[in-house]
Amino acid sequence: MMRQSLQAVLPEISGNKTSLLRKSVCSDLLTLFNSPHSTLPSLLVSGMPEWQVHNPSDKHLQSWYCRQLRSALLFHEPRIAALQVNLKEAYCHTLAISLEIMLYHDDEPLTFDLVWDNGGWRSATLENVS
């Protein structure tokens, strides 16, 4: 009897830990992006890259930006096993990115969307992370 009740409780505890891990990673990433003393290269945390104003549709520069951001985030966040960075919007004054994250010890992908807004990064998805 005792063994059956433990089996029923363990998945819920594991799910709570996974949810806490996901929220912690997203919160830490948002803090990293918005920190004035961030260890990320200034190009990646200043919001609108300089090239964006002059070449908003340059796919090579957008790809380079995503690769640089991916490399920096993988270096600074050890809980990320795999990461894909996508530009959702890249216009003259709008920058929105989507991070597709696989965490260690988590079988489900995590999507974390960030938008540059009024001089800082905000998350469109942090409240919905579970």
Curated annotation (Swiss-Prot):
NCBIfam families: PRK14128.1-1 (NF010726), PRK14128.1-3 (NF010728). GO terms for molecular function: anti-sigma factor antagonist activity. GO terms for biological process: cellular response to oxidative stress; DNA damage response. This is Anti-adapter protein IraD. One of its GO terms (cellular component) is cytoplasm. Inhibits RpoS proteolysis by regulating RssB activity, thereby increasing the stability of the sigma stress factor RpoS during oxidative stress. Its effect on RpoS stability is due to its interaction with RssB, which probably blocks the interaction of RssB with RpoS, and the consequent delivery of the RssB-RpoS complex to the ClpXP protein degradation pathway. It is found in: Cytoplasm. The keyword Cytoplasm applies. Its main location: cytoplasm. It comes from the Bacteria. Belongs to the GpW/Gp25 family. IraD subfamily. Interacts with RssB. The gene is iraD. Keywords: Cytoplasm, Stress response.
